[in-house]
Each structure stands twice: as structure tokens, then as C-alpha cells.
Amino acid sequence: MTLTTSDKAAVLADALPWLTALNDKIVVVKYGGNAMTDDRLKAAFAADMVFLRNCGIHPVVVHGGGPQISAMLKKLGIAGDFKGGFRVTTPEVLDVARMVLFGQVGRELVNLINAYGPYAVGITGEDAHLFTAVRRTVMVDGVATDIGLVGDVERVNTDAVLDLIDAGRIPVVSTIAPDTDGLVYNINADTAAAALAEALSAEKLLMLTDVEGLYTRWPDRDSLVSQIDSDALAELLPTLEAGMVPKIEACLRAIDGGVPSAHVIDGRVEHCVLVELFTDEGAGTKVVQST
């Protein structure tokens, strides 16, 4: 479908209330899933970030790299495993994750954004003490299970990110971080995005996924919800697929930490960030605090 000039003007005018509401606000976006592997979607995501920045909104990108890490592990002949939705991280796996996240995935996204101008700067959780990690376990069949060098975020130092925002840059964050003793951990990008959104007092947290949003009775396609409150979401958590658990935990953490809304959106939709932020229909599920 080709839009007329009037149609294009109407689209821009319709976005005005959302643009006004988000002006000078921080939006943390967790970049992952198919949006990271499809060239068309990667280009659209980069354009979305530049659009937000040039509309007076402050995007902060936190990226994963699961498919790329898995591909590199396979190429190197290193076994990989997941438990409770989290990657089991041995020292060998950590070395690969560190290399892939900052040197490949983050660098590619920075370059895509910077095709529009000198906007993006890549940093890791190790830089300027951005994240301080603490070792974590996950629940598997009701049992706390060790998953190696996987951390949670114990502290966030937002100084470096705020300096980049003040300079008009788009921070692109890789989620490798040390603990207080200097031991380095792989932090799930969903977890890191939520902690950073809370620490930055972000207006929104957006989580890109490979599904249309949140299903309350998966795989029943009719159970897709456009909005849910945090109490109802917490009740659903034990019933969710393992891969969705870190994302929903992240949404709840952000909401409990004062972020007004968290959004689980379909990263397979071109320009999904703009669709979610600036249209009534959206591109996923919005999570809000219970009243």
C-alpha cells in the first residue's frame, strides 16, 4: 500500500500526543531475537533509535546476543546448555560471550545507527563501573540451580550512560560485568535492561521478542493480551515457557522499581518500536503497575 502525502501527514500528526509525552524522557530498549538476525529488521531497528533521538527522546539500547553466541560456540566446538531460560556459562562460554557481545553484536548495531550520523557509542557493564554483578541461581523444577558465571545486577552506576545522553549519544550496552572482587559474569540482557531502566528512572522499558506479545494461556492464540497489570503478570509467571521467564521477570522488576510501563513487543515487526510507542494498536503487550 502506498500512502498519499495527506496520509503521511496524518500519520505524523497522530503521533504528536505520544511524541509530546515522551519528549526528554529515557526509553530503555532491550534488543534481541529475530530483530538481531534479520538484516531488514536490524536496519529498521537502527532507524527507529535514530528517529527517537531526533524527536527529543533518549533511547538506551541493551542488547543480547544469544543466537550469535550459540553460533560461535558451535563453530568452536564448545557445548552450550540452557537451564530455566538462562545460558549455563562456563569460563570458556564466558570468553566467547564477551567477544561476541561487544566485538560483534554491539559493534554491528553501533555501525548501523552511526550510518545516520555520529550517534551511538558502545559500552559494556565493565566500563565506568556501569554494572556490579552478583552470582545468581535459577529455579528449575522448584530447585535453585547453579548456572555458572551468570550474574544478577547488584548495583548500577548511571554516570557514564547519563554523560552519553547529555552529549546527544545513543548508548549501546553489552551485558558483561564484574562483581566486587573483579570476577566477571554474563548477565542476561533482559535482567540488565530492567536494572538499568530502574536506575535511570526511565519512562518505558521495551523488550523485543519473537512472539506477538504475552499469551495468558499459551499456545492458545486467542489469549494474547494488549495490557496487563503487575499482580496478574506475577500470578502468570510460574505457567510461562522458560524462554519467556527472564523477560517477564525483567518487566516486573522494572515496574516494581518505578518504571511506569514495560512492553513486551514483537521484534519480527518492522519498526516495531515506533509501532508500539506511536500507534493505538501497538506491537505487543503493555505491563503497568497494579492499582
Swiss-Prot record:
It catalyses: N-acetyl-L-glutamate + ATP = N-acetyl-L-glutamyl 5-phosphate + ADP. Pfam families: AA_kinase (PF00696). Belongs to the acetylglutamate kinase family. ArgB subfamily. Catalyzes the ATP-dependent phosphorylation of N-acetyl-L-glutamate. InterPro entries: AceGlu_kinase-like_sf (IPR036393), AcgluKinase_fam (IPR004662), ArgB (IPR037528), Asp/Glu/Uridylate_kinase (IPR001048), Glu/AcGlu_kinase (IPR001057), NAGK-C (IPR041727). The gene is argB. The record marks 30, 247 as: Transition state stabilizer. Pathway: Amino-acid biosynthesis; L-arginine biosynthesis; N(2)-acetyl-L-ornithine from L-glutamate: step 2/4. The lineage of its organism: Bacteria, Bacillati, Actinomycetota, Actinomycetes, Mycobacteriales. Its EC number is 2.7.2.8. Keywords: Amino-acid biosynthesis, Arginine biosynthesis, ATP-binding, Cytoplasm, Kinase, Nucleotide-binding, Transferase. It comes from the Bacteria. It is an enzyme of class 2 (transferase). It is found in: Cytoplasm. Substrate binds at residues 65-66, 87, 186. GO terms for biological process: arginine biosynthetic process via ornithine; L-arginine biosynthetic process. It comes from Mycolicibacterium vanbaalenii (strain DSM 7251 / JCM 13017 / BCRC 16820 / KCTC 9966 / NRRL B-24157 / PYR-1). Its main location: cytoplasm. Gene3D superfamilies: Acetylglutamate kinase-like. GO terms for molecular function: acetylglutamate kinase activity; ATP binding. One of its GO terms (cellular component) is cytoplasm. This is Acetylglutamate kinase.
